Amino acid sequence: MKKALIIIGIALGVILVALVAAGFYIVNANLAMEHRGQDIEGSYKEMKGDYPEMIPWLDSLQKTGGLKESTLLRDGDTKVHYYYAFAPQHTGKTAVICHGYTDNAIRMFMIARIYNQVLGYNIIVPDMPHAGNSEPNHISMGYYESQIARKLAASAQNIFGDDTTKVEIVVHGISMGAATTMMTVGDDNVNKDLNIKCAVEDCGYTSCWDEFSQEITNSYGIPPFPLLYVADLVCDIKNGWCFHDASPLEAVKNTSLPIFFIHGDKDDFVPTKMVHTLYEAKTKGDKELWVAKSSEHAFSYHDNKDEYIQKTKQFVEKYME
């Protein structure tokens, strides 16, 4: 009997060690890995190929020194790099534009062009931690990224405002950037303090937990329990946040800020059903929903450029004074 208990104990210990090791692997492989968003030159090349309409705008900004760069510190440690540009005509209207998972600021320049060239807004486009020219750290699926977006919104008054011009903000993000956007605007008091007027979220998920749950099943063919639970604990210990902390769903429940929800109906990375859950969960304030036909994940603009611009412009201009 005693020998059997020892064997069982050893087996359980081996299983526990294996689970913890697998949990560390999941966290590091998904949140602290090398990725395309760290390739600046490759990002420029790919974006110019996919979105040639942005080339004249970008070339003009770069030649005239209009595309400026700066940094801020996230909680005094990680240096966050961002681009910014003034509107063609002086204004306080400003867009904070948030990139997606394994992307960087450059990979959001097609959206930045809409706000700067078409709508005539100032723009701020950050490289979130572990992307672009920002310092390596880890991806937090919108948790720390939303805090950074708020800091940038707060900085906008110093960058673009003056004694007679009060800056007003729209936040726009795609994929993880959409999750970041929703969490950025999830507190009405903060929105009021920062003068955030509206938000556009494009193919954001309901929560990091929900997204990882379906990905672990799709990628590894296993249920979330127990591996995702162990990975969640590892992330909390290692990075200071849990997967449930990154919850756009809770954010939209709490905010009355106007939000435009966009999603492709062929999205299987962030399932289209998530946008309906988010839209229905927002019971306070204005909201609009557009499901782009035949578009896969993060391709709603790519596939429907004119309609995307028209719908975004129509929504945003209702709230930006």
Give each language-model segment a name:
Residues 4, 8, 15-73:
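An N-terminal hydrophobic leader/cap segment in hydrolases
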